[in-house]
């Protein structure tokens, strides 16, 4: 089932991501961002910035007035307006630990899907956060990455060049907990990459794959839909495989 064309879904993603960005950037120090609020639906520790960003996105969702199903890392699955076939898959802060500590690889991830499968995602939006800054620092808000099925992948409005096959020079590694890296060391070595980068955000790492800045990504445990739904569309629209 196609998405209802009464809504500009790309513009919605832009608004929702900007609102979430502003919510995160309002917490100007590591101490403020590090306040824990419990555990999200996915089981991870939730910080005040996760909740603030999620609340901002849900305000935009509710303003749409469209019956849909929202799936978020913190709240889980929520029927909005009675529920519907349209699904919005949200990770309000992918890379929460980075964001908490003031490291640059963190983002808001929003995917719009017409069905329950990854292959049903029609729009993906990834908005980089810079948690070192406050909302008043507009010129350095972070890059916007997005893709529309059948229309390509973009970074700040510029189309990403199609990906081409080449040597595996730089491999992105996610879920890089020490015990998982140790257990998988032989398998990682057998892949044959010259260098490894562990950035701490699945969505951001996939965006860098889509842009050709990383050659591939491997996760050491299964990836949740909220982490990958938006960015995997960028990879496929840029000509990569997921």
Regions found by a protein language model. Give the residues of each.
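N-terminal subdomain of lithium-sensitive/metallo-dependent phosphomonoesterases centered on the IMPase/IPPase/PAP
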Residues: 1-93
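Short, conserved micro-motifs enriched in small and acidic residues
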Residues: 44-52, 100-102, 200, 225, ...
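Short, Asp-centered acidic motifs that coordinate Mg2+ and/or phosphate
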Residues: 69, 123, 215-216
């Amino acid at each position: 089932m196609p998405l209802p064309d009464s809504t500009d879904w790309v513009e919605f993603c832009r608004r929702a991501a900007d609102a979430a960005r502003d919510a995160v950037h309002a917490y100007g120090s590591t101490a403020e961002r590090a306040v824990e609020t419990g555990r999200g639906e996915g089981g991870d520790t939730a910080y005040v910035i996760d909740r603030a960003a999620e609340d901002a996105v849900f305000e935009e969702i509710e303003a749409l007035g469209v019956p849909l199903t929202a799936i978020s890392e913190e709240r889980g699955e929520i029927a909005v307006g009675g529920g519907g076939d349209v699904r919005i898959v949200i990770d309000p802060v992918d890379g929460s630990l980075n964001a908490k500590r003031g490291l640059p690889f963190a983002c808001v991830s929003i995917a719009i899907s017409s069905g329950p499968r990854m292959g049903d995602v029609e729009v993906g939006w990834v908005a980089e956060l810079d948690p070192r800054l406050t909302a008043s620092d507009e010129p350095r808000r972070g890059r916007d990455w997005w893709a529309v099925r059948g229309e390509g992948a973009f970074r700040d409005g510029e189309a990403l060049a199609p990906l081409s096959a080449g040597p595996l020079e730089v491999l992105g590694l996610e879920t890089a907990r020490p015990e998982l890296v140790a257990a998988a060391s032989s398998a990682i070595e057998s892949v044959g990459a010259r260098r490894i980068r562990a950035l701490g955000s699945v969505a951001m790492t996939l965006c860098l794959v889509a842009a050709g800045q990383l050659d591939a990504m491997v996760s050491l445990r299964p990836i949740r839909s909220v982490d990958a739904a938006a960015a995997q569309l960028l990879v496929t629209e840029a000509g990569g495989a997921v």
